[in-house]
């Protein structure tokens, strides 16, 4: 047995040659080589790939010449580039997805406001989105408001009749619907129906590079995709809220009359005495704010989607959840700002 070596630049890899008719040779280069550079005091480590080859050598019986064949080869996925031994702190840290998505919300909202002020509105897309958000969402909103109104009526009538406050039931229902229930319930329904649609549509366009195609064609995605959805949501939510308030009060009055024997006239008269114009105006303002929150968050989550079909699903779910959280936070802030101090709306209903 004799030993040879193959010299390649400054590296030596030993090989062994076996004078046999059938031989299996395993070649394993070194895993780590230390290289010193003249004039440099800093050392670098070069990781060479680990290669395992199985060679079969067969001698021809006729002429004695060897024939060699390679059966398999396995290569590690280690990084071959020179790397410093001492890494800088936080060199591999990247911000969370929620951080840069949260930062994209005020940026996109500001761009939408600038487009509206400059008059850069794509009216055809705006009307299409307004039809989707308004009339096509009306049935679900009215159905939800009907059953929520009847559920609250059962609780209020059951307790107020024991106290002899039948004439206050309509006022309490009217205040609850106008100030809280109608705007919040309508926004929740729209967030589940349209917010998810916005995030899924824009997310699919983002991962399929359709937004890049719009930029190549000279169309701004903010003008063409996002601004129409924001305008449609802000315009449709107040009208949906008003319709939900009307249907909710009607269902409550019908249930009170049919089940508990409280006349519809008593419910309507009590509601008329308790309600004030500011209650309806505050509901409209709340619904507009909620519509802006739903559309901006859903569009922001959509245009920042990555990861293909899985990323689209995650963005859609996350957009709806964050929209609901934003609705509840905004509802608390607006309610604490609109209705401060002690109220006297029910004093005329007793």
Curated annotation (Swiss-Prot):
It holds the Pfam family MlaE. It is a multi-pass membrane protein. Residues 158-168, 251-288, 340-350 are chloroplast intermembrane. High levels in green tissues, but low levels in nongreen tissues such as roots. InterPro entries: ABC_MlaE_roteobac, Permease_MalE. GO terms for cellular component: ATP-binding cassette (ABC) transporter complex; chloroplast; chloroplast envelope; chloroplast inner membrane; chloroplast outer membrane; nucleus. Disruption phenotype: Disruption in the biosynthesis of ER-derived thylakoid lipids, and accumulation of oligogalactolipids, triacylglycerols (TAGs), and phosphatidates (PAs). Reduced growth with stout leaves and siliques. Impaired embryogenesis. It comes from the Eukaryota. Residues 67-86 are annotated as: Disordered. Keywords: Chloroplast, Lipid transport, Membrane, Plastid, Plastid inner membrane, Transit peptide, Transmembrane, Transmembrane helix, Transport. The chain crosses the membrane at residues 98-117, 137-157, 169-189, 230-250, 289-309, 319-339. It is found in: Plastid, Chloroplast inner membrane. Residues 118-136, 190-229, 310-318 are stromal. GO terms for biological process: lipid transport. Disulfide bonds: none annotated. GO terms for molecular function: lipid transporter activity. Permease subunit of the TGD complex, a lipid translocator at the inner chloroplast envelope membrane made of TGD1, TGD2 and TGD3. Interacts with TGD2 and TGD3 with an overall subunit stoichiometry of 2 TGD1, 2 TGD3 and 8 to 12 TGD2. Interacts with TGD5. Required during embryogenesis. Permease involved in lipid transfer from the endoplasmic reticulum (ER) to plastids, and necessary for thylakoids formation. Belongs to the MlaE permease family. PANTHER family: ABC TRANSPORTER PERMEASE PROTEIN-RELATED, PROTEIN TRIGALACTOSYLDIACYLGLYCEROL 1, CHLOROPLASTIC. This is Protein TRIGALACTOSYLDIACYLGLYCEROL 1, chloroplastic. It comes from Arabidopsis thaliana (Mouse-ear cress). The gene is TGD1.
